[in-house]
Amino acid sequence: MASNMVISACETSQPSDLVKTPVSIWASGQPSQGAAESSVPTLSYNIPPTRVPGSPILTPTPDLQHYQLGPARGPETYIVQPGDMLSAIAQKYSVSLPALAQANNIVDVNTLEVGQILTIPYVPPQPTGPAYKIIPDSELIYGPLSTLTDVDAFIRAKAGYLANYSQEVNGEILTAAQIVLLAAQNSSINPRLLLAILEYRSGWLTNPNPDPALDEQPFGFSDAWYHGLYRQLEWAAIHLNSGYYRWRTNLVTDWVLADGSVVPVAPTINAGTAGVQNFFAQLDDYSTWLRDVSPGGFFDTYQVLFGYPFDLAIEPLLPSNLIQPQLLLPFEPGVTWAFTSGPHLAWDAGSPFGALDFAPAETQGCDPSDAWVTAVADGLIVRNYIGSVYQDLDGDGNEGSGWTILYMHIAARGRVQPGAYLHAGDRVGHPSCEGGISSGTHLHIARRFNGEWISAGSPVPFNLGGWVASGSGEEGVGSLKRNDQVLESYNGSIPTNQIHR
């Protein structure tokens, strides 16, 4: 008999005269012995060569306008809805959290009452921000060319503080290169970008004796949780991703800077540049932000380290005719599971609503489960790490190219290992609470294409065995529809959310 208990939730343009040369790129996961060679094709990308010395650097083409600049607005009001957070309301209305709290005499920013009427203060905006493009989209995302840089060799060659840095992460001592790669791969941010920002903010890459005051906060963000290199990189990734995906989906028109300044976003920048602008908005006052995101600022550090970033632009990163390959439901035939969460954060704050959750129907809490999560398609297992398994569907071994599937909260017991080639329906492992924050045993599944997290709803909705996902706009609330059948997500197991192959 199906129970009504809560069982699972995730808490959480190039010069036309450049000749392009195709190269093959591999990541860490290679096919295991016995995998059919024909089933693991090699994917090639056309990469422009190093710029000929003295050849002109062409200005990147502006994007089409993402929005129209409107007239100045005055104060507004907002009625608090269930699930609202003051920080999210502040972000929605482009005001700082302190300014919103002060305007409403709120002492505890973590407490709101449903029905409470908030005054949204009017903050006169600064002039529109720079339209200067800093990096292409493909240099922000952990995309097809992210593996061109040997991070370990690069760090050692620079002989700075990072060359001898290590830190305990999740009970394991990791080198700086391992830490940077882990943060980059998990959040799907280009490691070159993380290294360049780290150098710009702290000098850790080239300076063997940087400011000791930055030891626990190399990006300059002070917080009890985000201390040490790994957590600081996670924090940076959140805000790089947030700027990128909110700009991609036309959810932002202004940046709110650390000093409370409001800056309208130049409507013709690209998403990669938006991510960088948003990152610096978290740390800077207005004059510093202008310096950081203009010519002569962060861009110069990036170019000194890695060359002109638009030489490696893959445009578009997502083709306009992108179609999801055929995917199965991620469990064995005849076994009942529950659809416990509609579209929600694919990875961490800042990522889009790209994930769906499923749980074995009779599981309680974080109890171990003998149910199996199965592969949704053929593909190579390229990586696993504390509850996560990454499957590369084009089989080239590079999780930044083509379609990639993330299976999250997979128990260590029976978990598939990197190098294995799975066919659709093969076993990946058991669902659990391992990895991230989870209130119950379940599977969290998400997709990436060329390293970009893909929203679970439109325009390329998740389609699992004919069940097509849609979202409501509210995190975790959504449905699956197949023909005339509709399942609504519910954080538990009830007849109306049960599903099987």
Name the predicted role of every residue range.
Residues 131-290:
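Catalytic glycan-binding domains that act on GlcNAc-containing polysaccharides
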Residues 325-327, 367, 374, 417-423, ...:
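Acidic, glycine-rich catalytic/binding loops that coordinate metals and/or anionic ligands
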Residues 319-322, 326, 337-375, 407:
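Short glycine/threonine/proline-enriched tight-turn/helix- or strand-capping micro-motif at secondary-structure
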